[in-house]
Each structure stands twice: as structure tokens, then as C-alpha cells.
Amino acid sequence: MRFRKVLLLFLLTATATTVVAQADIEEKNRRIVQTAFDNWRRSSGSVFDLLASDAKWTIVGRSVAAGTYQNRRDFMDQVIVPFNARLSTPLVPTVRNIYADGDTVIVLWDGAAMAKDGRSYENTYSFFLKMRDGKIVSATAMYDPIAFDDLWKRVRPVY
């Protein structure tokens, strides 16, 4: 009987330790991503600074940019750089909510900027960011493809 009590106590302690460690990792990842968005809002960085060099980025849906980019460089060169080259002001993010679950951080946010043709660009995004050692190792992004594609087709990038 004593052995069972000791075993039960051990299992409960081990489970509690695992739960606390998991909560610590979730909170740490959530803070890292929140800080990156805060920096982006202040024009002193962006969430893309967190991308590991081999991070995969997937844009779901039927947007002109939809697909999976196999690494940071491809994603930045094929999506972010040409996107920013269509804007006359930086995209400013406003985070609605950030959630963390395990190694994944989910961010719901709105972005607004002025396009080079003088029209405003506004969109709502959801990013599902898988984190490891403070870096994004894979991401899935969703946004309004009509707003994104309108900007992409309407405004020629100027580098």
C-alpha cells in the first residue's frame, strides 16, 4: 500500500512539473512573438526577424501568393520584399489576440498601410507560428486574399 502511495505521489509530481514546464514554454513563446509584433508596430523590427533560415511558410487559400515557401529567403524574396515595394508607408500591425498552445503561437492581427498609388491597404491576418528555441520554424498564414491580390495586381512594385 505504501508503495502505491509513493508511486502515485511521484506520478502526480511528474505530471505537475510537466504541466508547469509546458506553461512556461507557451508563455515564453507568446512573449517572444508579442515583442516582435510590438517592435514591428514601432518600426524597429518585425515578426519576420524570428524566422529560422530553414523555416517553411505556407499561405493558404487562392491568393496570388498562396503556396509553401521552403525557407526564409524564398519567402522574403518572393512575398515580403515585393509586397513592401508596393507600399509607400510601412505595414503597421495591430494585434487583436495572441494565443499559445504547446510550441505554437497563434496571432490574429490587422495590418494597415498606404499603397504607392495613394490608396489604403487594410487586411486581417492569422498566423500559426511553430516555435523552437525562440525562432519560427514553420508558419501557416491566412488573410483576405481579395484585399491582398487587389494590392498585388494594382500596384507595381518599386524597389
Could you say what each language-model-derived stretch is?
Residues 22-25, 81-159:
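A beta-strand edge to alpha-helix "cap/lid" segment located at domain peripheries
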